[in-house]
């Protein structure tokens, strides 16, 4: 019913053409009390991942053959709890000098569901804290002020609850969002709600605060 892995070293070497994965998996815990392969139904009770750091190198320039198979995916997955702590991913693409790094301090998802047959997705609660993202492309060094080729976000905090996506319908509650960028650009607070269907998108009670401005919709 559960799997635990601790201090696992990962090195894909040459097993995957055009891709190399290296890293350390500090602690991984997986608990499930209901996976039915026949009915394509899975209940994932608890997933925890911590102290994990992975580097991904992409160098594949070959064209992937088009998949012409037609296999229906009817899986229905229910996830009760997912927790991440001190997890980082370093994505490098040397052939086009692009790099993307992300570090997650803490992240938690509660009561998530995905129904692939009916294209229904959602979760009750999502919280992300202590997170940073760095994006770099082109040569080294960055311009003064905001540089879209060298973006460095830190102290990202995000809380999005009551998310539902079904067909063209979407609901979400932006409970909190804040972040800072190395250039000085920052979002002190962003809150609001989102409703959308095939004809309209509404964002009532949207409130954006920065250190020097405020916007309400």
Residue ranges with predicted function:
Residues 1-217:
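N-terminal targeting/secretion presequences
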